[in-house]
C-alpha cells in the first residue's frame, strides 16, 4: 500500500447527544465517516477500506485526520469540499447549503481506466470511493440485504410460481456487499451455497449471522444443500474456495441449482478476484510486483467462472449478473457471449425504479437500537397497507444484527420518502427518539446512477450510457439542501463503467430541517421517475402523472400545474 494508508487504530462513532462538532449538521457527517471505519462495519479499517475491493472512506490517514478536524470546526454557513477522499477547501455558503460536497474517483472519460486510476492512486492523487464508502453512508451488509431479497423474491415469482421453498441459490463472494446474499436468500425462503476465498470473510458473516453454517468441502456442502432443501428448510452454507474452480466443477458434476448469480469483487481484477491456483497472500504480493500479469490471471479465472454460469443458463437455470461487471471482464478476455444472461436490474428490479422505489436507509446517531425500533413502527404506521414492507421490517428486526450505529434499510419510493423523513424529524423534535437521525441511500437508486452493465442496462430507449442523469441528481440535491452530496465514478462495476451520486439529509427536529427534508426527499426519488419516464417507461409516466411531476416533454404530466 502507499504510505499513509495503514494505521492500526480502532475508530467508533460517538454515541449519545454530546456534540463533538458545532452542530448536528456537522456532527452527522463526522459520526458517519467514523462509522464507516468501525471494525464492526468496515472490511479492512486499518487501511481505510470500507467495502468493495479498495472502496475507502478517506484517501489516507492524514486526510482522515484533516477531515475530522475540518468537520469539528465547520461553521453553520460553511461547506467542506472533499476531492477523492482529501479535504481541499472550506468555503462560506449559507445555512441551507450542504455542509459537505464530495467528488470521488472522477476521471475524464478517455482516461477512466483502472490502469490510469491505479497510477494516480499509487501517487496519492486519487481514491476509489465505491458508492457509500467514500460518501460516508455505508451501514454494513444490511445496506444491500433488502435489494438482494427483493431480487430473489421476484426471481421466485417469475420462475417458481412465487415460492423458493425447497430451492437453492448458488453464488460467490461474502464481502461487504456479497455478504448480504446468504441472509437475503434465507429471508426469501431459499437455501444458498455461498463460495468465498477468504476464511476471514466467512468468519465475519458467521459472527454477524449473515450466514448459518460452513461446509468442510464441496461434497459436504452439497450433502447439506440436499438435506435442507428436501426438508423444506432455509439454511445458508458457506464454502471456502475459489468460485472459478468450484462453479465449473458443479457444472461438470451435473449439479443443478435453482438460481445462479455472483457477487465477488470482479469489478476490480487487481484487488478483488483471486486467480485460480493462487493464495490470497500471493495475489496481494503479485498485485504490487506484476499488476498486468495479475489482472490477466484474474480475468482468465473470471472467464472460466462466466463460462460455467453460461452453462447453467443453457441448462435453463435462471442465471443473472448481480452488478459486479464479471460479464464485461470475461468478454474482454474472449468470452464473446458473456452477456447472454442478464443483469439483475433489467431482469427483476426496473419496475421498482420506474416508481422511484429504491434503498432508502436511515441511521440513529444516538447509537440506541430503540430509536430504530421506534422508526420501524412509524414506517408501519405511515405505510399502513403494504404487507410486504411490514414483513420485511419484521424479518429485519429478527434476523439482522446492527453493525456500528443502528440503522435500517427499507425500499420505498417517491410516494413515501418525504412523508417518512418528515415523520422522523417530528420524532426528533418531540423527543420520541433520543437524538437526530440521518437519512441516505445507496447510489444504486432509480435516478442517481448511469451504469450500462448494471442499473441502466438495456434501457428501452438505448440511453444506457447517458450520465447526465446522476449529475442532475447531485445538482438538484445540492440545490434542495441535502446535508452532504457526493458524485462518484466507477462504483460497483469499476473504472469507466459508471457514474453515480449520493445524498444524506439530517433530521434534527428543527423547522429548517423539515423544509430541507421536504425538498430533498421529494426531489431525489422524483429524478428517478423523471429519468425512466424520459426513457419511455409507462410505469414511470403513470407515476409522474399521479405524483404531479412537471416534466415538460412528457405530455401526460402537463395541465396540472
Curated annotation (Swiss-Prot):
Top-level taxonomic group: Bacteria
Q: Name one GO molecular function term.
A: urocanate hydratase activity
* Cofactor needs: NAD(+)
Q: Which PROSITE patterns match?
A: UROCANASE (PS01233)
Q: Which GO biological-process labels does this protein carry?
A: L-histidine catabolic process to glutamate and formamide; L-histidine catabolic process to glutamate and formate
> Which residues are recorded as binding NAD(+)?
52-53, 130, 176-178, 196, 201, 242-243, 263-267, 273-274, 322, 492
The note on the cofactor says:
Binds 1 NAD(+) per subunit.
Name the pathway: Amino-acid degradation; L-histidine degradation into L-glutamate; N-formimidoyl-L-glutamate from L-histidine: step 2/3
Q: Where in the cell is it found?
A: Cytoplasm
EC number(s) reported in the record: 4.2.1.49
List the GO terms this entry assigns under cellular component, sorted alphabetically: cytoplasm
The reply on keyword Cytoplasm is yes
Show the catalytic activity. 4-imidazolone-5-propanoate = trans-urocanate + H2O
**Catalytic residues identified in the record:** 410
Record InterPro entries: Urocanase, Urocanase-like, Urocanase_C, Urocanase_central_sf, Urocanase_CS, Urocanase_N, Urocanase_Rossmann-like, Urocanase_sf
Instruction: Give the UniProt keywords, A-Z.
Output: Cytoplasm, Histidine metabolism, Lyase, NAD
Q: Which family does it belong to?
A: Belongs to the urocanase family.
Q: What does this protein do?
A: Catalyzes the conversion of urocanate to 4-imidazolone-5-propionate.
Q: What is this protein called?
A: Urocanate hydratase
Organism whose genome encodes this protein:
Enterobacter sp. (strain 638)
- What high-level taxonomic lineage is stated for the organism? Bacteria, Pseudomonadati, Pseudomonadota, Gammaproteobacteria, Enterobacterales
